[in-house]
Amino acid sequence: MLRMLIAGVLVVFACVNSAEAAGDDKSARGIVERLQNGIFEVLKHAKELGVDGRYELILPVLERDAHIPLMTATVSGPYWREGSKTQKERAIKAFAEMHSALLAALFDSYNGETYKTVKVRETGGKIVLVDSNIIDSDGEPTLVTFATAKIKGRWWVIDVIIAGGISEVKVKRNEFNRLLEEGGLDNLSAALERKKDRLLFGEEKAVR
């Protein structure tokens, strides 16, 4: 039953992504809207899919639209340069899967939330910021700013800032520092893998 539902949602994805309004990777605004569109399509089917179904659909959306390798390298700091190719590949996979599990656990219901792109801001450098309001069912907006960059001919999301706070990448870098100090990339990857499993099994509550 779950496989059939996932297949059905994937059909919806295909229809949505064929529409011009769904966004694309040719602009900063386009990549942000494509990422949000993908997440919101999963959110609309949250209850029926369950956490495992949401995870299976969110993971490819993140891998498609967020530059996971760059984000993993950034949060790992100097330990990234010290890692082998195998260690880096494991860390990238663990980072993507843990964040997908976190979103799958967080987005467990849909109450009519919507999103709206508010502004696209140049920074004078390679990064372009895209401000978006996530609007709840009461009409209350929460500002989410996506940092984007053009890498190898296309746009990627490389960081997220919620309600004008600190960037998620900086938060994660501080959070992961102890793990990296104690055992480098292997220790970080193992911790992320355990966290993913706890989130999917309901042994750990997702925190925004």
Indicate residue ranges for each PLM-predicted region:
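Sec/Tat signal peptide C-region and signal peptidase I cleavage site
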Residues: 15-23
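Surface-exposed, polar/charged faces of alpha-helical domains
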Residues: 23-30, 41, 45-52, 82-86, ...
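Short beta-strand edge/turn micro-motifs at domain boundaries
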Residues: 143-171
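Low-complexity, intrinsically disordered terminal/linker segments enriched in charged
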Residues: 161-208
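Early exported N-terminus immediately downstream of N-terminal targeting peptides
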Residues: 24-103
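Bacterial N-terminal signal peptides
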Residues: 5-15
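Soluble periplasmic/extracytoplasmic beta-strand elements of cell-envelope proteins
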Residues: 33, 40, 129-133, 143-147, ...
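Surface-exposed, charged secondary-structure patches
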Residues: 100-142, 192-208
